[in-house]
Each structure stands twice: as structure tokens, then as C-alpha cells.
């Protein structure tokens, strides 16, 4: 197994040397990663959801808070390909991580604690059935606007895919609320499957379907399109006479993607952080595992920063000392544009219980900043352009001399990462010192700040929101100061 993986790594390094002659490079390392911690596997007692959004540059990420909205009768929603559906009377408030120009890269958390993100999981479907052009970009937005629970979100996704068909090559949507986590696997066209993550377990996905065994009689934990097995038989992807049980991932995933070590190695590395040595490195990995210890937000952050350090797969560039672009994708890599950990807690007002720990640029060399749902808006500078940048503009922004500019959050963090990545081996230690200090303070202040906000909330919600916003803004400004210190140090 390791010999085959290392052979691929060497091939990747050689390939990168060829394609690196022009800028930007081919997206070596391009691929998302997601985690769901079941409520009984978390320290909080509620679901934690996390995601690294990996897309090769040029990109920009905006963060916005969108208010609850009332809609007039007879209003319609138009889908990207031209399909239409009736608008609902009320759409819920949500936090929106937006990547302009990208159809499948946005993520959301709404006012009920329903969180949705996705991983590309290419399928072998090449004859998708679509109505009115199908649905793609708007699926996650509609879930955020309309669902009050994760199960409602899955049900809505099912209705949309059954009606329009899914207009993409395969994807896993991660849909969670404080009590449940689901993987909704859209194959393409009108075939899909969804599986619930066990409450006491942790599941990860890294760009390939992870649902294997399917219990069609268990509609509490599995939902599928009616002909999910029969369709596979009709396409000669599954033979029931073989004696082998129906394995969704084996049947529907693109075989090359499923056997790609850059995908299953990332899945394994995520699971090893959770379950330790009980999960051996293999192409065949469990859907979910029982953790050695219950996880909190800080433990999940550690997983999102993983680069195989401490394993035989860990490699670094001889030029920069970075684990990036060494031939095998890492969970945190140079294409990670934004990352988040969502604490989805009940037992208190959701304005306080929902916490969005977000990071701009690759988290292995960046900072997580907490934002409670109750904030009225993100700090100035967290949303700027509504368009995807050009190659030249992106290069100009990240290669310019570093300036800690609070009015341009994405460009400040991206520029910082560019400077660190060029001399990663010599600079990462000082980055980690600053990151640890700021994040430890953020976690230490978390509970006392929430206690103050809770006292205020029943009498003055605006004052409670200001308390939460001041906490977040203070952490944000401290990250800007830290980046300036790191790059100003001799």
C-alpha cells in the first residue's frame, strides 16, 4: 500500500515540475474535506460540522449575514439553468460564505442551526436525467433559506433533485443541525442516497462517496431514490447474482476517484485523528468511527490543519519546506480558500449557541476567528467583490508587499499565506506560536463572553449582539497584528 502511494507522490512532484512553468498552476491538491461529529461524540453534546473549501486560485471569499425575509404571494425562484419553483412566504436568516463565480463552493448556516456545505464526489453517471436543465448552485441556498432541521434539509434536497435532476457529476452535501448530521449523495440526474451519521460517531468525506452498506428498510438512517439498486443493475454497475451486497460507493463512485490515494489518504488521516491506530490505511475505510475521546471545536480545528505530519506519508518540499505540492493531497493545502468549524448548540438562544469558527486561507498557516450567529454583520472587509478575480488581479494582490488591512480580510490573509508558503520551513514555527496564543485566548474567553451575552439577551438583544461582535472583532484585529509581527520579524 505505502509503495503504491509513494509512487503516486513522486509522479505528482514530477508533474508539478512540468506544469509550474506558468502561473497559476494546475490545481494539484484541489479537493475539499468535511467532518461531522455526532452529538454524543462531542464535548458540547451537540453536532459539530466542519469543512475545508479547496479551490485553486484565482478566488475570493466573502462572508455575509443575510436577514430573515418576507416574500410576497406568487413570487418565484429561478434556478441557474432556467427552472422555476414557488417562493415560500418566509426565508430564514443565514450566514453565507460566498465564492463568486463558483457553482459549488458556498456554505451556509441558518438561524435554526441548519448548516450545509459540500464535497465534489465524482460519480460514473454519464446519462443524467434532467428537467428544465436541472438544479446545481441553488440547492444549498434553498436548504439554508427553508429548512428548520437537517432532516428537513435532506427532504428538501430530495424533492429538488427528484423534480429537476442534479446537474453535476456527483457530490456529497453535508447537512447538519444541533441534533443530526447527514451526508446527501447526489449521483447526477435523479439518483441519490442519504445516510445519517450515528450520534456517537464521527464521519469524514474527502471527495469520494463514503457510504458503503445500505439498509433500505431503515428509513430513520437511510433515504434513497426508489430505483437506486435497479438503476445500477440496468447500467451493469451492480450484479445481484454476484453474491456481493449492494455497496453504494463501490457501485456509483467514479472508480478512478475512489481509488485515488489523495482522497482515501485524506479520509484515513481524518479518521486516525479521531480513532487512532484502530483505523489502518486502506482504500476501504469505514463510513464513521467511534472517537477515542469526545471532540470539541479545538480538536476539530486540529484535523482541518492536518498535513500527515507524524505519519509515513508526511513529505516536504526541499525548496520551501512546505508539505504542499509534494504529490499527495493533504487535508490542509494551498488551495484551501476558507475553512470553518460550526458549533451547533441548543440549550441557549441559537444566536449565542451557533458559533462559526472561520478561517481565511489555508488553516495550517492561518487563524480561526469565532463569530456567533447573533452578530448583525461581519466586520468591514469580510465582503468585497461580487466577481471572481482575474489571474492577474489575484497575483497582484497576493504578491504585493504585506499590509495588514482590516478593510480587505481575504486579501490580507491570502497575501500573508503567500509570504509564508515561499519560506514555509523557516517561518511556520513563528506562525504556530502566534496562532496558538490567539486561539487559546479565544477559547478561554469564549465561555465568559457567552455568559455576559446570555445575561443581556433577555433584556437587550442588541447589547448581547454587540458583546459577541466585540469579542469577534477583537480576535480579528489581534490576528492582523500577529501577521504583521511575523512578517516584520528578522
What are these regions (language model features)?
Residues 153-162, 300-307:
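Short, well-structured alpha-helical segments that form the helix of a local strand-helix-strand
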Residues 317-447:
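Substrate-recognition/cap regions that form aromatic- and gly/pro-loop-enriched pockets
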Residues 9-22:
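Bacterial N-terminal signal peptides
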Residues 264-325, 329-334, 431, 438:
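Accessory, solvent-exposed terminal regions and/or long lumenal/extracellular loops of proteins
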Amino acid at each position: 500500500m505505502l509503495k503504491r502511494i509513494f509512487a503516486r507522490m513522486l509522479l505528482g512532484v514530477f508533474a508539478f515540475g512540468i506544469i509550474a512553468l506558468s502561473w497559476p498552476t494546475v490545481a494539484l491538491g484541489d479537493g475539499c474535506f468535511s467532518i461531522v461529529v455526532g452529538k454524543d461524540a462531542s464535548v458540547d453534546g451537540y453536532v459539530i460540522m466542519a469543512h475545508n473549501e479547496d479551490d485553486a486560485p484565482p478566488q475570493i471569499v466573502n462572508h455575509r449575514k443575510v436577514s430573515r425575509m418576507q416574500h410576497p404571494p406568487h413570487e418565484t425562484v429561478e434556478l441557474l439553468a432556467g427552472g422555476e419553483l414557488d417562493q415560500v412566504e418566509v426565508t430564514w436568516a443565514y450566514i453565507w460564505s460566498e465564492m463568486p463565480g463558483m457553482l459549488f463552493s458556498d456554505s451556509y448556516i441558518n438561524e435554526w442551526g441548519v448548516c450545509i456545505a459540500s464535497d465534489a464526489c465524482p460519480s460514473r453517471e454519464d446519462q443524467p436525467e434532467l428537467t428544465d436543465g436541472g438544479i446545481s448552485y441553488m440547492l444549498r441556498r434553498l436548504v439554508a433559506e427553508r429548512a428548520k432541521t437537517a432532516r428537513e434539509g435532506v427532504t428538501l434536497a430530495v424533492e429538488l433533485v427528484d423534480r429537476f435532476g442534479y446537474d453535476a457529476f456527483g457530490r456529497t452535501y453535508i447537512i447538519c443541525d444541533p441534533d443530526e448530521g447527514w451526508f446527501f449523495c447526489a449521483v447526477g440526474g435523479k439518483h441519490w442516497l442519504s445516510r445519517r451519521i450515528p450520534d456517537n460517531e464521527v464521519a469524514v468525506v474527502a471527495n469520494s462517496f463514503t457510504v458503503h452498506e445500505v439498509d433500505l428498510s431503515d428509513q430513520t438512517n437511510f433515504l434513497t431514490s426508489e430505483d437506486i439498486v435497479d438503476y445500477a443493475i440496468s447500467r451493469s454497475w451492480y450484479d445481484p447474482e454476484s453474491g456481493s451486497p449492494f455497496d453504494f460507493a463501490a457501485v456509483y463512485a467514479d472508480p478512478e476517484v475512489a481509488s485515488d490515494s489523495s482522497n482515501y489518504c485524506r479520509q484515513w488521516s481524518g479518521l486516525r485523528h479521531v480513532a487512532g491506530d484502530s483505523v489502518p490505511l486502506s482504500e476501504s475505510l469505514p463510513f464513521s468511527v467511534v472517537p477515542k475521546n469526545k471532540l470539541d471545536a479545538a480538536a476539530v480545528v486540529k484535523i482541518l490543519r492536518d498535513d500527515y505530519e507524524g505519519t509515513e506519508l508526511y513529505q516536504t518540499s526541499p525548496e520551501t519546506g512546505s508539505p504542499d505540492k509534494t504529490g499527495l493531497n493533504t487535508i490542509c493545502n494551498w488551495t484551501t480558500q476558507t475553512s470553518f468549524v460550526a458549533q451547533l448548540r441548543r440549550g441557549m438562544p441559537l444566536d449565542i449557541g451557533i458559533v462559526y469558527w472561520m478561517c481565511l486561507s489555508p488553516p495550517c498557516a492561518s487563524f480561526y476567528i469565532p463569530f456567533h450567529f447573533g452578530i448583525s454583520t461581519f466586520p468591514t472587509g469580510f465582503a468585497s467583490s461580487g466577481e471572481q478575480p482575474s489571474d492577474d488581479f489575484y497575483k497582484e494582490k497576493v504578491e504585493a508587499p504585506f499590509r495588514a488591512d482590516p478593510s480587505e480580510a481575504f486579501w490580507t490573509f491570502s497575501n500573508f499565506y503567500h509570504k509564508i508558503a515561499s519560506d514555509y520551513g523557516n517561518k511556520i514555527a513563528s506562525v504556530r506560536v502566534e496562532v496558538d496564543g490567539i486561539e487559546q485566548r479565544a477559547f478561554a474567553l469564549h465561555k465568559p463572553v457567552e455568559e455576559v451575552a446570555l445575561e443581556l439577551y433577555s433584556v437587550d438583544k442588541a447589547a448581547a449582539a454587540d458583546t459577541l461582535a466585540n469579542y469577534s472583532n477583537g480576535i480579528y484585529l489581534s490576528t492582523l497584528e500577529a501577521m504583521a509581527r511575523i512578517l516584520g520579524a528578522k
